[in-house]
Swiss-Prot record:
Its EC number is 1.4.3.5. PROSITE patterns: PYRIDOX_OXIDASE. Substrate binds at residues 9-12, 67, 124, 128, 132, 192-194. One of its GO terms (biological process) is pyridoxine biosynthetic process. Keywords: Flavoprotein, FMN, Oxidoreductase, Pyridoxine biosynthesis. Signal peptide: none annotated. Its cofactor is FMN. FMN binds at residues 62-67, 77-78, 83-84, 106, 141-142, 186, 196. Binds 1 FMN per subunit. It comes from the Bacteria. It comes from Nostoc punctiforme (strain ATCC 29133 / PCC 73102). This is Pyridoxine/pyridoxamine 5'-phosphate oxidase. Pathway: Cofactor metabolism; pyridoxal 5'-phosphate salvage; pyridoxal 5'-phosphate from pyridoxamine 5'-phosphate: step 1/1; Cofactor metabolism; pyridoxal 5'-phosphate salvage; pyridoxal 5'-phosphate from pyridoxine 5'-phosphate: step 1/1. Belongs to the pyridoxamine 5'-phosphate oxidase family.
Length: 214
C-alpha cells in the first residue's frame, strides 16, 4: 500500500542539545554546527531559506546561499532589483532557516538587513567564475521573459562585450547581511520532544538563552 503524505514521518534519535553544552555566543555555536555540517559532507550546507515580507504583509521565501558569516551577521549576494531585493529595501526584516537533515538540526535566524560594503561586494564578485559574473549582467532577476532564448542571446551579447577583459560588478548586484536579533538552535529528539534553544539579543549587546517547548 502506498504511503500518503500524512504517513511520512521520522523519529529523531541522534543526540540532544543542552544549555550546559552550548556556547554563550550564538555565532560561535553556529560555527560549531556549521563546521560539523561541513565535516559530514552534507550537500550545500550553506543553503538557507530566506523569508521576506512586503510592507503590507505579503510573505515570500526562496533558497539562497550563505557566503559569509561572523559576529556582524549572515551575508548573501543577489540582484538588488529582484523581488527579494525590492522587498528588503522596502521592509528590511528577514528570517533565515538552515536545515541539516543528516544531523537532525535546524537553525532559525531573525533580524534586520543591511547592504554590505561596496568593497565586500566587489571582493566576492571577483571570486565568481566568469560565466557567473556575466550572468549577473544578463538576468534582470524576477522579470517576466518570453523564453530561455532571451537569456541565451543576452549571454552572448555580454560575452562579446567583455571578451578578454575584466567583468565589472553590476551596480544593481551585491551583498546583503542579516543582522540577527534572535537565533534558535533546534535538535530533533524522540517522540517529537525536540530541543529548542533560543538566543535573544539584549539591549547591551549580550545574549540570553531560553529553552522553548517543542
Amino acid at each position: 500500500m502506498d504511503k500518503t503524505v500524512a504517513d511520512l514521518r521520522k523519529d529523531y534519535t541522534l543526540e540532544g542539545l543542552s544549555e550546559l553544552e552550548v556556547d554563550l555566543n550564538p555565532f560561535i555555536q553556529f560555527k560549531k554546527w556549521f563546521d560539523q555540517a561541513l565535516a559530514g559532507q552534507l550537500p550545500e550546507p550553506n543553503a538557507m531559506t530566506l523569508a521576506t515580507v512586503t510592507p503590507d504583509g505579503k510573505p515570500s521565501a526562496r533558497m539562497v546561499l550563505l557566503k559569509d558569516f561572523d559576529e556582524r551577521g549572515f551575508a548573501f549576494f543577489t540582484n538588488y532589483n529582484s523581488r527579494k531585493g525590492q522587498e528588503l529595501a522596502e521592509n528590511p526584516l528577514a528570517a533565515l532557516v538552515f536545515w541539516w537533515a543528516e544531523l537532525e538540526r535546524q537553525v532559525r535566524i531573525c533580524g534586520y538587513v543591511e547592504k554590505v560594503s561596496e568593497t565586500e561586494s566587489d571582493q566576492y564578485f571577483d571570486t565568481r567564475p566568469p560565466n557567473s559574473r556575466l550572468g549577473a549582467w544578463v538576468s534582470n532577476q524576477s522579470e517576466v521573459i518570453e523564453s530561455r532564448e532571451v537569456l541565451e542571446r543576452r549571454m552572448q551579447e555580454f560575452y562579446s562585450k567583455y571578451e578578454n577583459q575584466e567583468i565589472p560588478r553590476p551596480p544593481h548586484w551585491g551583498g546583503l547581511r542579516v543582522i540577527p536579533t534572535e537565533i534558535e538552535f533546534w535538535q530533533g529528539r524522540s517522540s517529537r520532544l525536540h530541543d529548542r534553544l533560543l538566543y535573544s539579543r539584549l539591549d547591551n549587546g549580550t545574549w540570553k538563552i531560553d529553552r522553548l517547548s517543542p
